[in-house]
Amino acid sequence: MLATSRRVLVSILAVGAVLAPAMPAQASSPAPTPIGRGDLRPLRPKLPPGPSTLASYTLLAPVSVSPSQLVARAVLKPGTNCPALATTKKVGTQTISRNYPMLERTVGPKARTAFATVKVCSAAIPAGITSASVGGRTVPAAIPANVNRIGIMADTGCRVEPGRIQDCAKAWPLAQISARLAAQKPQVILDPGDYYYRESACPTTDWAKCGANPPVTPVAGMPFKDSSNGWMTDAIKPMSTMFPVAPIAFLRGNHEACDRAGNGFFLFLDPRPTTASTCEPVAVGAHPVPASPAVTDTWAFAFSVAPGRRLKVAMVDSAYGTDDKVTNWVPTQNKAYKQAAAVTTKQAGWESWLMTHRPIFGRQAGNGFAPNFTPWVSNDQAAASRNLLGNYQMILSSHIHLMQAVQIKGQPPNLVVGNGGTMLDANTTYPIPNFGPLAKNTGQPIDPQYPPYPKASSIWTKVAFGFGIATAAASKNSWNFSMQGPGGNVFGTCALVNPTGTAPNLGCK
């Protein structure tokens, strides 16, 4: 049986090589090409996952990258060839089978020492595909005709840093959350960021909590915290139960800044073909330094919710900036929010969500007594997005490690889902502050250039591990949210209601 499977596999790859033109090794995915009569051939038998394929998954992507808005990615053992993206397509009564080449994706040369234990391959998924697999593993092949069930999770990695060691072995629920979310059968999954928390070597005294095989530790000589071993342990393996279920939109968080885990984020999770080396260190004398802070371009994807109803999600990079004050980062960040506003111009029949890691309206723990204290997060984002939020029915964020919904009159509500597995924030009360975002405790502006927002009309907070499921309501612009724990218990429900399309309200209980 094994010999037969090998002969079938060799035959498949040989046919794929004839049908697909040879392409140079580069980081970009090939443009999909039409399937012609010469591509007709019998449907191949399904093969077991290849032993060299460690993971395969589908990323949501901008249409400029893939007309289907989907990119297939594979993580392999080093020293192996990129597999083919194997697809089928229905044409009338016939099933057409075709292989597409996947191309290697690499971090910049100065970061490669830290990522030598894997090989990553990528390919745009052509539009109209019925099924797809990589290395024998099924991956989502198409966005459903109507998407009315969305999974949401974020802030997932296991925290390992001096003074704060999470029990990764027994009390880190990411794998359980991923499996439970997958069982809910979402049609797409949204993840606003923060995947990598193992930023220090596990102390020998805490090996029972955070030890890993192979060990996860920053690589000597690298001016950043992550590695391929770390990404496999902290994200790829525990999330893998979700991969066959739905395409995922990944956005980087502050933990994926270039001096932390940015190299791995752009290698594994960013869908764009030109971003893999975004965080390559810069040579300064004998020692490399992290790439300078920068905001990557805003991008968006869209899908149908129901006939006459479509949703667009704008993806804004907020990995950098400051939470508790307004800084000179605001003009740089402002460009990303302007780009998002431009791609979500209001149209009849369209709804828009803004997805950005740092909340624009988020309530952190504590009340503070110092005049300059503010309980609001993140003030750089609130300032940078000022007067640019009118297109959205909702803002989706994470960053603070809890689940929260904040409503401010005249603004889209901010849903925070930052409870996907990393160490939670304080389990205390989160009352409505006396003043709105961009205000000090005294009510005065944090920065005179940016007037404070009104006092919040409602804040709902739950400090518990879990995820969210958004289900489209019958009315346009309206969604229902179920907030669930790792075991499937529902600990909160929310309703996003916006009957006129101009006054969204998110009520939770």
At which residue positions do the language-model features occur?
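Bacterial N-terminal signal peptides that target proteins for export
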Residues: M1-I12
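Short acidic, glycine-rich surface-loop motifs adjacent to enzyme active sites
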Residues: P192, Y196, T344-A365
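Acidic, histidine-bearing metal-coordination/catalytic regions of metal-dependent phosphoesterases
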Residues: V10, A20-R164, L174, A179-K185, ...
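Conserved, compact domain cores that house catalytic/ligand-binding motifs in diverse enzymes
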Residues: N146-L251, E256-A257
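Short, solvent-exposed loop/turn elements at domain surfaces
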Residues: C158-D167, R198, C258, T322-K325, ...
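Active-site-proximal beta-strand elements of phosphoester/diester hydrolases
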Residues: V147-I165, R310-G321, W353-H357, P412-N419
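Divalent metal-coordination and catalytic microenvironments
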Residues: A74, D155, I189, D194, ...
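Extended active-site neighborhood of metal-dependent phosphoesterases/phosphodiesterases
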Residues: S133, A208-A342, K346, A370-P375, ...
